[in-house]
From Swiss-Prot:
GO terms for cellular component: urease complex. It holds the Pfam family Urease_beta. The lineage of its organism: Bacteria, Pseudomonadati, Pseudomonadota, Gammaproteobacteria, Pasteurellales. Belongs to the urease beta subunit family. This is Urease subunit beta. Its main location: cytoplasm. One of its GO terms (biological process) is urea catabolic process. Pathway: Nitrogen metabolism; urea degradation; CO(2) and NH(3) from urea (urease route): step 1/1. It is an enzyme of class 3 (hydrolase). The keyword Hydrolase applies. It catalyses: urea + 2 H2O + H(+) = hydrogencarbonate + 2 NH4(+). It comes from the Bacteria.
Length: 101
């Protein structure tokens, strides 16, 4: 092995297998772009984003870690959300949950 070398398995990486997902139509009703990161609790995003928030409770974007989705003003797009893993305790963001889901 060479220092710093990666030894990766063959095949694709499967993320979020077996977790609940939901697809939602999201519209940016604001006058500024809004960007949402991969692990942001989607339920607590900027309120200029209009979508079914109850379906987004306990969910985040189903995109690779470190990625984000940008919503331009007036833009509507469908996103796929995936449930948070672990013990389902959420703190921070807009402090709308601050505890167990």
């Amino acid at each position: 092995m060479i220092p710093g070398e990666y030894q990766l398995a063959d095949g694709d990486i499967q993320a979020n297998v077996g977790r609940k997902t939901v697809k939602l139509e999201v519209v940016n009703t604001g006058d500024r772009p809004i960007q949402v990161g991969s692990h942001y609790h989607f339920f607590e995003t900027n309120h200029a984003l209009k979508f079914d928030r109850l379906q987004a409770r306990g969910m985040r974007l189903n995109v690779p870690s470190g990625n984000a989705v940008r919503f331009e003003p007036g833009e509507a797009k469908e996103v796929e959300l995936v449930e948070f893993g672990g013990n389902k305790v959420i703190y921070g963001f807009h402090n709308e949950i601050d505890g167990k889901l």
